[in-house]
Amino acid sequence: MYIYTVKPGDTLFDIAQKNGVTISALVAANQLSDPYKLPVGLALVIPGQSIRERSIVVNGYAFPGISDIALLGALQYLTYLSVFSAKTRIDGTITELNDTALIRKCYVNGVAPVLTLTNQRESGGFSGDIAHAVIADEEVKTKLIQNVMEYLDRRNYFGLNIDFEYVREEDRTLYTQFLLDFAAALRRVGYSFSVALAPKISQEQSGLLYTAHDYGAVGSIADKVIIMTYEWGYTYGEPMAVAPIDKVRQVLDYAVMEMPPEKILMGMANYGYSWTLPYKKGTAARPLSLSEIPQTAYSQYADIRFDLSLIHISEPTRP
């Protein structure tokens, strides 16, 4: 906690953004009867610790049950921690999380806690049917936005991340409007807003994972865009890297043509796979954690081929 003195031209929105807290937290901490009237010189209590400024912006995802050892080891490197996830129901309600302690630890360590909203079933797996139910019905959509806004305020989140996957191609325009409506509601009270997108290399790219994700539109709507640049190598696929550098580069080269580069957060896989060779089509690869990957290489006396000189992303000129 510390004190901020109101300066000429300050608004509550500006002060909240500048100090990494929500407007509701400022109002509650200072018992403001009229948040829209801030006299110059007023001393405002800024609750908690401000969000650290970094030379790069880093977002991490975590389940509420993450261990303290893993959490505290990661928080020192993060700008945002996206808590995964509140699941959307077809009636516009959401599942709630055991997230109170996690949010508090984020603020104590100068990290912004962000709620991730998904179209996952409660039994698991992303559902295009759930997405359609809440974006195609205005009444349900309004109810969902209201429920999310109330939850963000009640739990003192810093912002919202939307991760809707496998949205139907015919719902592309509806999904974009859904994001616009959420953005308007969030910005009225000063929340940050990010959207997760599938890794596209062109506007025309086909496939259920890609078609409803409009890079240009989302880039103009969201504060940050998290691009899922991974999963080329997958459980039942042929042996290959999870995130091949040439594939990642193709996605980012396209992305910076469609949206401001400073909005883009490149996704990084925190897992790998081990295939049994010779590979037989239809067989499953064994998933590996980041700590298991080098251990597996060492146990097989395999070389780890890591070349930093290959990791360079050019920035094409936007039209």
Please report, for each region that a protein language model flagged, where it lies by residue.
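Active-site groove signature of glycoside hydrolases
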Residues: 145-174, 227-238
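Hydrophobic faces of well-ordered beta-strands that scaffold small-molecule active sites
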Residues: 58-60, 81-83, 113-117, 160-162, ...
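Second-shell loop/turn segments in exported
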Residues: 12, 88-94, 131-138, 164-172, ...
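Primarily a LysM-type cell-wall glycan-binding module
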Residues: 1-21, 42-44
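Substrate-binding surface in catalytic domains of secreted glycosidases
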Residues: 90-97, 173-177, 181-300
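Glycan-recognition patch characteristic of GH18 chitinases/ENGases
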Residues: 49-147
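Active-site beta-loop-alpha junctions enriched in small/polar residues
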Residues: 63-65, 86, 118-120, 165-167, ...
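Glycan-binding loop/region signatures in secreted carbohydrate-active enzymes
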Residues: 119-124, 128-131, 272-314, 318
